[in-house]
């Protein structure tokens, strides 16, 4: 069944343009509430669902939060408001408080004038595709309102921030602390601005916080995981041991060492697999179609299974759950530790990296010295919405030619973004100059 509104990470778009309008978001709240009410009454006759709403720091969050509240209330659903908290905080609190669902108002790493809505189930996982389709179907039903005595109530959740801080700290080994470690934390002027610095500080680190003054208009603006130059500069200026940059909703990260070198999600996954192997057996790990070939080669030599999922943390999660594995990640910095959390969490991922450094007594560079990443070139080409690259004859011919030239010493990946009107062209080869040249050849054929 074709989706009308839900993408790979909920409903997302430009604020004020369909579907991110007050009217649509109110109807979305009502539709989701209607579906949740059906589930809830099936489990416990006469009961009513409660949902938790969290948001990042975008100015439009106030408007969309109010619209969701109205829609849920009209459907007879009670609402708890967490205020600005990371996406993974909503997943955790929904599960911990035994709520029916969690809702996040965020567009992650996108600019401030974008926003989005995504849902978590009662278990703290992203909604199943079937449930999202049910909500889409419910959107086609005219909105009404339950009787006045059945309207949903709305209240604030006391100390959502403190509850989540304690949860994050609980994932760090009891026998370790961060005393003697100087950390720069870039919060992207986003949802973790009042949380991440305190987590690391309470574990003993000396913390320098940047990107922690949200205005409603500056989320991800020259800061955060997608703009690491600010972090690199701050790490060097403060002579820090490590830098950690989160994105706007704090579900992913990048790390920088004392020299200013940036470490990718692929390198972090390699570090974490090796660290886990030092304390327990590791059956396998999950990457994506974009994961560097070097990991595949290294894991094979280590006797560890490796599977590529489609790009998107929800698909990495599905592949892990299917196999009963615990560790997965994307090069963009989405990391999954299923023995720690049900979803990607930038703060918890940082704590796992820090625990590996503490446990080994080594630096990031030392922990990755035995793996040489294949050079990758990724080019994003802006296209019109709905553009189908698979019907572009020139691109397909050039792709086939490049693959023939690479043979077994590289690969080509072309895919459409699930959240933006972009075609991503990636070429991986043992030679960086070759990868760059071939990626540009393919990208040049894109006519839209």
UniProtKB/Swiss-Prot annotation:
EC code: 5.4.2.10
Post-translational modification note: Activated by phosphorylation.
A Pfam family recorded for this sequence: PGM_PMM_II
PROSITE patterns cross-referenced by the UniProt entry: PGM_PMM
GO MF term list: magnesium ion binding; phosphoglucosamine mutase activity; phosphomannomutase activity
GO BP: any one term: peptidoglycan biosynthetic process
Binding locations of Mg(2+): 108, 247, 249, 251
InterPro entries for the chain: A-D-PHexomutase_a/b/a-I, A-D-PHexomutase_a/b/a-I/II/III, A-D-PHexomutase_a/b/a-II, A-D-PHexomutase_a/b/a-III, A-D-PHexomutase_C, A-D-PHexomutase_C_sf, A-D-PHexomutase_CS, Alpha-D-phosphohexomutase_SF
Keyword line: Isomerase, Magnesium, Metal-binding, Phosphoprotein
CDD domains: GlmM (cd05802)
Active site: 108
Chemical reaction(s) catalysed: alpha-D-glucosamine 1-phosphate = D-glucosamine 6-phosphate
Cofactor names: Mg(2+)
One cellular component term from this protein's GO annotations in UniProt: cytosol
Enzyme class: isomerase
PTM sites of type Phosphoserine: 108
Cofactor note: Binds 1 Mg(2+) ion per subunit.
Entry similarity comment: Belongs to the phosphohexose mutase family.
Record's function text: Catalyzes the conversion of glucosamine-6-phosphate to glucosamine-1-phosphate.
Entry protein name: Phosphoglucosamine mutase
Organism field: Herminiimonas arsenicoxydans
């Amino acid at each position: 069944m074709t989706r009308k509104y839900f993408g790979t990470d909920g409903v997302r778009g430009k604020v004020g343009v369909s579907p991110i309008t007050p009217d649509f978001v109110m109807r979305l709240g009502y539709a989701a509430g209607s579906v949740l009410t059906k589930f809830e009454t099936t489990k416990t006759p006469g009961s009513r669902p409660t949902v938790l709403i969290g948001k990042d720091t975008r100015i439009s969050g106030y408007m969309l939060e109010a619209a969701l509240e109205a829609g849920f209330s009209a459907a007879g659903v009670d609402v708890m408001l967490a205020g600005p908290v990371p996406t993974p905080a909503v997943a955790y609190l929904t599960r911990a408080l035994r709520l029916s669902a969690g809702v996040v108002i965020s567009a992650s790493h996108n600019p401030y004038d974008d926003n989005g809505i995504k849902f978590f189930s009662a278990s703290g996982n992203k909604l199943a595709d079937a449930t999202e389709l049910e909500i889409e179907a419910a959107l086609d039903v005219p909105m009404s309102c339950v009787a006045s005595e059945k309207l949903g109530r709305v209240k604030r959740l006391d100390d959502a921030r403190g509850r989540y801080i304690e949860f994050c700290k609980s994932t760090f080994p009891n026998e370790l602390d961060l005393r003697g470690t100087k950390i720069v934390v870039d919060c992207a002027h986003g949802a973790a601005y009042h949380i991440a610095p305190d987590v690391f500080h309470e574990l003993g680190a000396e913390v320098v916080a940047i990107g922690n003054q949200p205005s409603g208009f500056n989320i991800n603006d020259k800061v955060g995981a997608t703009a690491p130059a600010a972090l690199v500069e701050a790490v060097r200026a403060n002579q820090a041991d490590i830098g950690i940059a989160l994105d706007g909703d704090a579900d992913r990260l990048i790390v920088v060492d004392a020299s200013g070198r940036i470490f990718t999600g692929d390198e972090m996954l390699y570090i974490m697999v090796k660290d886990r192997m030092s304390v327990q057996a590791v059956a396998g790990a999950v990457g994506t179609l974009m994961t560097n070939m070097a990991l595949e080669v290294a894991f094979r030599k280590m006797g560890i299974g490796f599977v590529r999922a489609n790009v998107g943390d929800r698909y990495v999660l599905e592949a892990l759950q299917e196999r009963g594995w615990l560790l997965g990640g994307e090069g963009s910095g989405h990391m999954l530790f299923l023995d720690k959390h049900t979803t990607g969490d930038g703060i918890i991922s940082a704590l796992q990296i820090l625990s590996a450094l503490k446990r080994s007594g080594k630096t990031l560079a030392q922990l990755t010295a035995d793996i040489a990443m294949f050079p990758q070139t990724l080019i994003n080409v802006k296209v019109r919405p709905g553009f189908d690259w698979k019907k572009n004859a020139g691109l397909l011919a050039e792709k086939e030619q490049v693959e023939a030239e690479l043979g077994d010493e590289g690969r080509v990946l072309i895919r459409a973004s699930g959240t933006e009107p972009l075609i991503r062209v990636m070429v991986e080869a043992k030679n960086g100059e070759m990868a760059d040249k071939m990626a540009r050849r393919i990208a040049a054929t894109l006519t839209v």
